[in-house]
């Protein structure tokens, strides 16, 4: 993380204790809490009935999120606009579609799924794993250009457990096309570009902490952001609550969430010497413990509102391609179809191939710079000689060379 040396007005994240206190809810007795919960349940149901996405997003961000799985089963498909996919997936299995190239890896990962939750008899777990395999396979066969990545199954298993097998099919398709599309490209380079937003968010909010982290590359956030935190969070109640928030907001907010977690750990990170980057990287790669999920969610929402992507320093947002899911999702009123997502996927794939060709060419030139330089010089001299002879300037030039030679001899 390069230090720009600029000091500007920043949000009050530096006073960690004060900001922590501001996110704590006022103490209420059990009766008041029960009444507030019941009122929130009614409000969520009303928002679902009227398909009020803004109200649902507000409830998903507030303490406790959408509260219960039966509410999530109504709200999540609305947030993900699953109606657009339902007609495309009439059945749970798609044997008529061609086998996807990544299905072997899918099976390996499915066998390692459901590590932390749910706690169920072996027979039930085998059934869940088969459902998970069917679910992933169907979506990949329907959209064969998508590249499976290890950790995708962590995301899908959350959708499966909350929504059930049938409802999860369009939800998985929607989240793949409109939220994690960049992660399903043939290369991880787009995901790395996402990560470089994190130093910019830290820079604009807490330059002191950003300087302390120095030039540490933000790869420490890859596993968490790639899997929407499903790989790292071990409690089902926590990950389902976090998905309330992530599904209600645009994709880039998942990056802001990781930045918010870093900012909340300022004191801990400053205690680690700056000349121990390995220890800093190790600490940053682990989520805070204990995990104050509601607090981190509120911080992330505030960070995003105060410092939207377009305002970030270090040019990080400019490096995100126009066809990235982060940019195409910035318009809250944009109505993209699955066909649009496929088109954008192909455009970004073309960009990746172009970048890779350019990088290979530059690497070749650098590794052969001496021989390439000699050839280039020879070509330049030859071209200059041809130009001089063609213009009839050779006699004049040799005349000047003779004068210079005589002047040097006289001076010596």
Language model features by range: what are they?
Residues 57, 76, 137-140, 156-160, ...:
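Amphipathic alpha-helical segments within well-ordered protein domains
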Residues 39, 55, 70, 74, ...:
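Acidic, Ser/Thr-rich intrinsically disordered and amphipathic helical segments
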Residues 1-140, 335-412:
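N-terminal transition regions in large eukaryotic proteins
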Residues 31-34, 105, 173-220, 251-340:
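Extended, Lys/Glu/Leu-rich amphipathic alpha-helical scaffolds
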Residues 53, 84-86, 201, 234-239, ...:
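Coil-to-helix interface segments in alpha-helical RNA-associated scaffolds
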């Amino acid at each position: 993380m390069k230090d720009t040396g600029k000091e500007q007005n920043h949000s009050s994240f530096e006073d960690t204790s004060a900001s922590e206190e501001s996110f704590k809810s006022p103490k209420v007795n059990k009766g008041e809490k029960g009444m507030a919960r019941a009122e929130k349940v009614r409000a969520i149901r009303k928002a679902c009935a009227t398909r009020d996405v803004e109200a649902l997003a507000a409830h998903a961000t507030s303490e406790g999120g959408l509260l219960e799985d039966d509410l999530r089963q109504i709200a999540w498909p609305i947030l993900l606009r699953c109606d657009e996919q339902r007609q495309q997936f009439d059945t749970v299995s798609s044997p008529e579609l061609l086998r996807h190239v990544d299905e072997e890896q899918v099976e390996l990962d499915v066998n390692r799924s459901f590590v932390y939750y749910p706690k169920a008899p072996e027979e039930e777990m085998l059934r869940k794993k088969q459902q998970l395999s069917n679910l992933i396979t169907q979506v990949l066969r329907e959209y064969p250009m998508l590249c499976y990545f290890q950790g995708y199954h962590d995301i899908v298993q959350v959708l499966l457990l909350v929504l059930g097998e049938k409802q999860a099919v369009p939800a998985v398709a929607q989240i793949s096309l409109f939220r994690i599309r960049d992660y399903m490209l043939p290369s991880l380079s787009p995901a790395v570009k996402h990560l470089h937003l994190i130093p910019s968010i830290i820079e604009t909010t807490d330059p002191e902490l950003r300087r302390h982290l120095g030039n540490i590359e933000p790869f420490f956030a890859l596993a968490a952001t790639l899997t929407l935190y499903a790989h790292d969070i071990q409690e089902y109640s926590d990950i389902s609550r976090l998905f309330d928030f992530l599904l209600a907001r645009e994709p880039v907010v998942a990056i802001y969430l990781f930045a918010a977690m870093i900012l909340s750990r300022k004191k801990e990170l400053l205690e680690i010497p700056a000349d121990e980057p390995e220890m800093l990287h190790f600490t940053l790669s682990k989520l805070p413990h204990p995990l104050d999920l509601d607090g981190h969610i509120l911080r992330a929402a505030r960070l995003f509102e105060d410092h939207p992507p377009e305002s970030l320093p270090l040019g990080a947002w400019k490096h995100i391609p126009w066809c990235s899911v982060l940019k195409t999702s910035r318009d809250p009123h944009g109505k993209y179809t699955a066909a649009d997502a496929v088109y954008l996927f192909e455009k970004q794939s073309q960009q990746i191939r172009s970048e890779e060709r350019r990088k290979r060419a530059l690497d070749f030139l650098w590794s052969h710079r001496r021989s390439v330089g000699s050839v280039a010089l020879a070509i330049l001299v030859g071209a200059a000689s041809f130009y001089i002879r063609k213009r009839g300037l050779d006699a004049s030039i040799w005349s000047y060379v003779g004068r210079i030679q005589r002047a040097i001899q006289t001076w010596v």
